[in-house]
UniProtKB/Swiss-Prot annotation:
Gene3D superfamilies: 3.30.230.10
Chain's gene name: rpsI
UniProt keyword list: Ribonucleoprotein, Ribosomal protein
Top-level taxon of origin: Bacteria
GO CC list: cytosolic small ribosomal subunit
Lineage: Bacteria, Pseudomonadati, Pseudomonadota, Gammaproteobacteria, Pseudomonadales
Signal among keywords: no
Family affiliation: Belongs to the universal ribosomal protein uS9 family.
Any GO BP annotation: translation
Protein name: Small ribosomal subunit protein uS9
């Protein structure tokens, strides 16, 4: 890997994102599509941009992402995590601000499995007393 790019792996739920940070003008490319095309929801786009806005580096980098697995929310979270890790690789002094914002920690919440005898993970069948 060349010294001109920084790499970060991000994960959230079942989504995994590989993020490459290169000096540039602020283009974000996800699976060879622009951010606006890939994410229809504005909230997902906002989540992806959060670490860049916090570190005031929106126009400093071009970001290339390959993401797989999960849904829209999980993929957005995985990309955010990957961008955060790549930014820390680029400049370790950003770690404190990113940590305080809560972007460094991997969100460990996963879907709880369905149990036998229950309708969902915790929903029980209706109880009849008589």
């Amino acid at each position: 890997m060349s010294a001109t790019q920084n790499y970060g792996t991000g994960r959230r739920k079942t989504a995994t994102a590989r993020v490459f940070l290169r000096p540039g003008t602020g283009n974000i490319s996800i699976n060879n599509r622009s951010l606006d095309v890939f994410f229809g929801r504005e909230t997902a786009r906002m989540v992806v941009r959060q670490p860049l806005e916090l570190t005031e580096s929106v126009e400093k980098f071009d970001i290339y992402v390959t993401v797989s697995g999960g849904g829209v929310s999980g993929q957005a979270g995985a990309i955010r995590h990957g961008i955060t890790r790549a930014l820390m690789e680029y400049d370790e002094t950003l770690r404190g601000a990113l940590r305080r914002a809560g972007y460094v920690t991997r969100d460990a919440r996963e879907v709880e499995r369905k149990k036998v005898g229950l309708r969902k993970a915790r929903k029980r069948p209706q109880y009849s007393k008589r």
